[in-house]
Regions:
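Start-transfer (signal-anchor) and selected internal transmembrane alpha helices
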Residues: 1-47, 57, 152, 292-307
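Membrane-water interface of alpha-helical transmembrane segments
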Residues: 20-28, 120, 124-127, 148, ...
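C-terminal TM-helix exit segments that contain a strictly Trp-centered aromatic cap at the helix terminus
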Residues: 98-102, 252-260, 308
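Perimembrane helix-loop-helix junctions
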Residues: 219-301
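Membrane-interfacial loop-to-transmembrane alpha-helix junctions, especially the N-terminal start
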Residues: 26-30, 150-153, 195-201, 237-251, ...
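Membrane-embedded helix bundles of polyisoprenyl
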Residues: 34-38, 126-141, 150-194, 198-232, ...
Length: 308
């Protein structure tokens, strides 16, 4: 197995079952902890949620953006026309990726609860599903790198960490919770035994993260840099680096086309722009070429990284 997390992964011997138990049991541990924790958050936030009082203006504006989408505003039209109405509205930088689960819950519950009831359901369910995704990813990772006895504590520590819990309160439907989940998906890719599959998962997760918000760029750069340094030290990790860069570049282009379209190629605040796509494609091409020319050469890879 060639993975950055190799020193942390427990050995595959008979001691593993005694230490951690069967891997398929991790979800049975995650679900009750998640249900208890989110039930507590609902109780603590019930009055705020029932009165439609938001934690942050971004959540309120996100709901309005989804309302407009379901009312017929174009998929690629991200203008908020209620802001600066005289000037033709303000173009929002927010990704439609985050709108999808909110819109899905609202559409699913409208026949049962009506329009307002469906909105209330989305404000309750979407943060809960985000927390479930985060805790499930922590469980999936933790069962592979931690003793089983430590897994409940890991779940609680992550879920109760201030940067996490403030983003998954009932009513918090903006993109920050999904950023946390995608960071964990990128980490999970390092635990895949297959370098190419793991690299593609990590790269695609980073692409989604930055498509949601360009705030993910610094941490994505650190992850790629750490992988590049590891690949320089260990030739077995070079296919993983290549796959990660390829997935990052190709998924970024696909997500840009699917959520922004090519009718607006200008730079916008906190959003991927064509110049970023060009940089990702150039970097992926340089590293891929270096690997194809001399797969085992540290010098060639270093040159490819320099060109990238």
């Amino acid at each position: 197995m060639t993975t950055l997390a190799a020193p942390l992964v427990p050995s595959r011997d008979s001691d593993q079952n005694a230490q951690m138990g069967p891997k398929h049991n991790w979800l049975a541990l995650v679900l009750p902890i998640w249900a208890g924790l989110y039930g507590l958050l609902i109780a603590l936030n019930f009055e705020r949620w029932s009165q439609l009082r938001f934690h942050d203006p971004d959540d309120q504006l996100r709901l309005q953006q989804v309302r407009d989408l379901l009312a017929g505003q174009g998929w690629f039209d991200l203008h908020q026309y209620r802001i600066d109405e005289a000037g033709g509205g303000v173009l929002m930088h927010w990704s439609r990726l985050v709108d999808l689960p909110i819109a899905g819950v609202m559409l699913a519950f409208r026949p049962l609860l009506g329009v307002q009831g469906a909105e209330m359901a989305a404000l309750l369910l979407v943060p809960g599903l985000t927390l479930l995704a985060i805790m499930a990813l922590v469980g999936w990772i933790g069962v592979r790198v931690l003793p089983r006895a430590a897994l409940p504590m890991a779940l609680l520590v992550v879920a109760l960490a201030v940067p996490v819990i403030v983003q998954i309160q009932p009513g918090r439907i903006d993109h920050h919770g999904w950023q946390i989940a995608l960071a964990l998906v990128a980490m999970a890719g390092f635990l895949f035994e297959d370098d190419r599959r793991g690299g593609w998962l990590t790269g695609a997760a980073l692409a989604c993260w930055m498509a949601i918000s360009f705030e993910g760029l610094p941490l994505s750069a650190w992850i790629i840099a750490a992988l590049a340094l590891a690949a320089l030290a260990d030739a077995r990790l070079r296919p993983r680096l290549v796959a990660t860069m390829q997935a990052l570049a190709l998924a970024s282009v696909a997500l840009f086309a699917a959520t922004r379209g090519f009718g607006d190629l200008a730079n916008h605040c906190d959003a991927i722009a064509p110049v970023h796509l060009a940089a990702f494609l150039w970097g992926a091409a340089a590293i891929t070429a270096a690997h194809l020319v001399r797969p085992g050469s540290r010098t060639t890879l270093l040159a490819g990284l320099g060109v990238a």
